[in-house]
Amino acid sequence: MPSVSEAKREYEERFNGCLTKYGRVLFCLMDNVRSQQVHDVRRDLRGLGELVMGKKTLQKKIVERRAEDKKASAYDKLLYNTCIEKKLLCGNTALIFTNEEIPVITAVLDKHRVQAPARVGAIAPCDVIVPAGNTGMEPKATSFFQALNIATKIAKGTVEIVSDKKVLSVGDRVDNSTATLLQKLDISPFYYQVEVQSVWDRGMLFLREDLSITDDVVEKYLLEGISNVAALSLGAGIPTAATLPHMIMDAFKTLLGASVATEYEFDEFDGKNLRKAALEGNLGGGVADAAAAADTGAAAAPAAAAEPEEEDDDDDFGMGALF
């Protein structure tokens, strides 16, 4: 059996080897994770990465010595400073070293997610809701529900829950009454797994909430931003690569509309045929609408100008209109 110092030396060599070989480090929470889960995760990570556990004090010393070495890179120094500042090497955590994309690793971890009952003293990792419906329990069991303020009624000789009731929120500690009731209802509400808390990716630290941002989400936000900028530029009349085609098309529609309204023909861009098609109603899309609007506006102008003449006729009668 190797001595303690020899075991530490071998562990340090393995840890340093992982830091050299892999560019990504996943810091994972191991609370309530069973040894069999760890074994299964390690098995499925073969060829993808390595899961390393151990004492945090030893891991800190290894990272510190690596950063203080004369041959230490800026990457090694930054990793050490980040581990100390963000307290990454604390608590019940494990490290997964990999060069694979993060979703590949999280898919392996999610595969070994285990359902578990709510035990007394456990911290709820999620909200727990007892659903409405018949429980199949005898009326004498109503005391369990009353202790948790769950509305019930007796239906066909059994206890029936009137409406859904939240009995635990995230972070709550499971008490004896809640654990007993959930056990009687055969509800195992908790799920435990190796859970990624943060990722060190070649000099950058990503927190848990950042991991939900995928390439598809980034593309969606980027397209929305481009669309908003294009709409703003178009409304302000500022030519950009995105708005210039629309501005040219709008100007051409206006020109064609003016051609239809004033009987002016232009040879460029097949203007004569387009004008003829607009007059015959064979021109589709916004161009026809613009031409029709211009034609309607031109026809309405003489009618508007004729209105004062009717008022002049009334004025000719003078007082005679009273008789």
Swiss-Prot record:
> GO biological process annotations for this chain's record?
cytoplasmic translation; ribosomal large subunit assembly
Q: What is the lineage of its organism?
A: Eukaryota, Discoba, Euglenozoa, Kinetoplastea, Metakinetoplastina
The region called Disordered is annotated at 298-323
Check the UniProt entry and state the signal peptide residues, or none.
none
Q: Which organism does this record belong to?
A: Trypanosoma cruzi
Question: Which UniProt key words apply to this protein?
Answer: Phosphoprotein, Ribonucleoprotein, Ribosomal protein
- Keyword S-adenosyl-L-methionine included in the entry's annotation: no
Q: Where is the composition biased (Acidic residues)?
A: 307-317
- Please give an example of a GO cellular component term from this record: cytosolic large ribosomal subunit
Fill in the subunit field for this protein: P0 forms a pentameric complex by interaction with dimers of P1 and P2.
Q: How is it modified after translation?
A: Phosphorylated.
Q: What does this protein do?
A: Ribosomal protein P0 is the functional equivalent of E.coli protein L10.
Q: What is this protein called?
A: Large ribosomal subunit protein uL10
Which family does the record claim for this protein? Answer: Belongs to the universal ribosomal protein uL10 family.
